[in-house]
Structures are given as C-alpha cells and as structure tokens.
C-alpha cells in the first residue's frame, strides 16, 4: 500500500503555510482588540460531551463523528467542533466564579466523516470565539461585530451578515408543533433523511440541501413569527445595536444552524462567489448549553469560521499578501575554519532578526551558490581562511551577482541597510 495522507485530509506545504499564518495572526489581533483570550483544549473528548452538547439528533452526532473505544473501554470522540469543548473547559476550571462575561477564542482542527466532494475535508480547521456569562443583546451584537470586522480587516467587502432568531425553548414549542404539521402534510416530497428528522427534530429539515426539501422549506412556518415577547424584544435590540456598530445585515427567517444547542439569535456570514453564496462563518446564542452538560445556568454565544473556505476566498479575490522570502541570507563556507566562522556570523545576523541559513553539506562553492539562488536568498556571504585572516567576508548580491568586501564586525549593519531597500 502506498503511504499517503488519509482521504479528506490535506498537508500544508511551506509555500502555503504563510497564508495560514497570515489569517491566524489577523484573527488573533482582532480577538485581542475585543478582549478575547486564547484557550486550547484536547483534540479528543469523552463522547458523551458531544452527545449532550451538540445533540443526539444532529447529523454530526448521528453520522459524522470519529468515535472509538480506547484501551480502557471508554468511548472517545475526535472533536467535531469547538463550542462543546470550550463549554466543558469553562465548567471544569471554575470560570463561573470569575467576573462575567468570560471571552475565549481558539484556533483548532476538527474532524467529521463527511463526503469529500465540493471542497469538504474530514479534518478541517476553524477559528472560533465563545462568550460566557451575558444574556444581553449587546453581547450578540459585539460577537457578530467581531466576526464582521475580522473579515473586513482582510479586505473582504462582498460579505453579507444574515441573522435570525429561533426563540427560546418556551416559544419554540408552538413553532415546532406548526412546523411538524406543515412538513407532515408535505411528507411525500421529503428526502429519506428528512422523513427521519420529522419526528425527532423537524427544524433540522430547514438545513437540508436536497432540492426537493429546499423547495418545500420556502413556504414553511418561520420561527421569527412565533417569538414570545422577550425573544422578540431581544432580537429587535440586536438589530438596533448592530446598526450602532455599523454592521449591515439581512434578516433570513430560515437560518436555524445545524446544532441543537442554539437559542434566540443565530447568524451566518456569507460571501458572494460567482453569483453564489458561500457560508464562511456561523454562530449563535446557546443559553442552555452550560447547564445541559452539567454546569450552572449560564448564557453563552459564539461562532466558528471555516479556515479552508476563507483561504480559498482570499486567494480568489487576490487578498493574500506576497510570500515573504525565507531565508534571506546564505552563508557559504570554504574549509573547516569557514564552517566555524559561519556559525558566528549566522548567530549575529539572527540576533538582528535576519533569517539566515548556513551551508551544511560540504558542497563546492559553485554548488553552494546554485543552492542559495534556488532557495531565493537575496544575499550570500562567503567565508574562508583568506577572509578570516583579514577580518572580512565577501557579500554577493544574488540578483546582480555583484560582490563587496565587508568587515565581519559591520556585516549586520550592512545587510540591514541593504535588505530594507
């Protein structure tokens, strides 16, 4: 068998990794501006966390999780998303006793056994934030504003924020009852999966991507029409505060999100690509999740961003920066003394923040210069017995092939000046 990456996974190569670093750093910057702190949690959790947190009736739990028994017979699952793990972390480490709200962000890989067509992966990457402790609509607007401003900081201007409210467990009962009646009357048009959803959780039908189900959904009851006074007031306030935050939005009455823990505000951010909408961020409020997995009654809200989709979008729109050249300087050596001196010169340059590599393979000077050219170095330093004796080194400009003699003690200042031009 040929050894290769498993289906649905992808290696990130050196020529791509700078793009990942760019968006990761941008996300960190924006999160810090909003007062969020990074958390890191295990790649796997006890399966029960996702069964209770994400929901037994969701496609994620029923079809997509990577679950196995460990050697102790415990059921373990590779995380399919980040919210449940962050909620578990919040409970386990006693954050409920700290000042509220608590603001967390994370950068993770997640795992779902999905069809790999259409650019989907079985290991994929997410940026996410979670805000615990505030049930205020101000928090909803702040969270949506953070996501919106992250995308605009990357130069994306063809994005739309779609918002909705799916109400609380009290007012949702009436909505679900009417929704079930509507879909039951049209059950012959539903796909096989949605027939199963009809009894367990009819709201999941609104998420179905099958064309037949999408057509029926257009005339289905809308959760926004069944909101109680409290949920209605909350949603109106969210819209008011988004206006104040200068975040443009549209109300989409059929956004429900694919996870069972959501309450009240839900939202998606989509980008327009070739006249088609591509979801790049999704989130919402989950006021019962902490209690659902064994913690106190504490409200929460958050979102997740698909990194692979985001990078594809940035690349298509020409919004990624040029790859910075690494390394910038190559130290070519002649003889044993040259090798020893190369360590000293490289250490000096690296201390000044100049990316430097030294010859490691004992090649001829001609071969060393070819190598330096192939890896894109801007300058090569040549050091051997003659140069050491005089306290100098040769510096070759790899673009022009011109050479200058520079005193070793001045090499850092010389290259700093040249590399700035």
UniProtKB/Swiss-Prot annotation:
Reaction(s) the record says it catalyses: tRNA(His) + L-histidine + ATP = L-histidyl-tRNA(His) + AMP + diphosphate + H(+)
Broad EC category: ligase
EC number: 6.1.1.21
InterPro entries associated with the record: aa-tRNA-synth_II, aa-tRNA-synth_II/BPL/LPL, Anticodon-bd, Anticodon-bd_dom_sf, His-tRNA-ligase, HisRS-like_core, HisRS/HisZ, HisRS_anticodon
GO BP, sorted A to Z: histidyl-tRNA aminoacylation
Main subcellular location of this protein, as a coarse class: cytoplasm
Subcellular localization: Cytoplasm
Keyword Signal found: no
Keywords, sorted A to Z: Aminoacyl-tRNA synthetase, ATP-binding, Cytoplasm, Ligase, Nucleotide-binding, Protein biosynthesis
NCBIfam families cross-referenced by the UniProt entry: hisS
Family: Belongs to the class-II aminoacyl-tRNA synthetase family.
The protein's name in its UniProt record: Histidine--tRNA ligase
Organism: Caldicellulosiruptor bescii (strain ATCC BAA-1888 / DSM 6725 / KCTC 15123 / Z-1320) (Anaerocellum thermophilum)
């Amino acid at each position: 068998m040929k050894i290769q990456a498993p289906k649905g996974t992808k290696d990130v190569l050196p020529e791509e990794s700078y793009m990942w670093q760019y968006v990761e750093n941008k996300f960190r910057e924006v999160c810090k501006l909003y007062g969020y702190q990074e958390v890191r949690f295990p790649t796997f959790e006890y399966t029960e966390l996702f069964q209770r947190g994400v929901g037994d009736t969701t496609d994620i739990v029923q079809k997509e999780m990577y679950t196995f028994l460990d050697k102790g017979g415990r059921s373990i699952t590779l995380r399919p998303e980040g919210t449940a793990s962050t909620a578990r972390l919040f409970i386990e480490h006693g954050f409920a006793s700290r000042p509220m709200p608590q603001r967390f962000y994370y950068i993770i890989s997640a795992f779902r056994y999905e069809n790999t067509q259409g650019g989907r992966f079985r290991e994929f990457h997410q940026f996410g934030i979670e805000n615990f402790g505030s049930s205020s609509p101000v928090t909803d607007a702040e969270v949506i504003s953070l996501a919106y401003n992250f995308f605009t900081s990357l130069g994306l201007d063809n994005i739309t924020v779609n918002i909705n409210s799916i109400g609380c467990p009290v007012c949702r009962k009436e909505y679900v009852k009417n929704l079930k009646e509507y879909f039951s009357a049209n059950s012959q048009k539903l796909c096989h999966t949605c027939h199963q959803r009809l009894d367990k959780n009819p709201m999941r039908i609104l998420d179905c991507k099958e064309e037949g189900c999408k057509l029926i959904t257009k005339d289905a009851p809308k959760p926004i029409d069944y909101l109680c006074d409290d949920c209605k007031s909350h949603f109106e306030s969210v819209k008011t505060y988004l206006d104040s935050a200068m975040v443009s939005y549209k109300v989409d009455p059929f956004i429900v999100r694919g996870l069972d823990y959501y309450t009240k505000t839900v939202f998606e951010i989509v980008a327009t690509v070739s006249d088609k909408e591509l979801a790049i961020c999704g989130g919402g409020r989950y006021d019962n999740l902490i209690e659902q997995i064994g913690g106190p009654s504490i409200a929460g809200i958050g979102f997740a961003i698909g990194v692979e989709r985001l990078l594809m979008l940035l690349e298509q729109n020409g919004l990624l920066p040029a790859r910075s050249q690494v390394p910038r300087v190559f130290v070519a050596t002649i003889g044993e003394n040259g090798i020893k001196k190369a360590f000293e010169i490289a250490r000096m340059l690296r201390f000044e923040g100049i990316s430097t590599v030294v010859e490691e393979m004992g090649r001829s000077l001609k071969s060393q210069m070819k190598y330096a050219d192939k890896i894109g170095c801007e300058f090569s330093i040549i050091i051997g017995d003659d140069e050491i004796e005089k306290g100098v080194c040769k510096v070759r400009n790899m673009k022009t092939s011109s050479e200058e003699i520079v005193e070793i003690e001045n090499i850092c200042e010389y290259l700093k000046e040249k590399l700035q031009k």
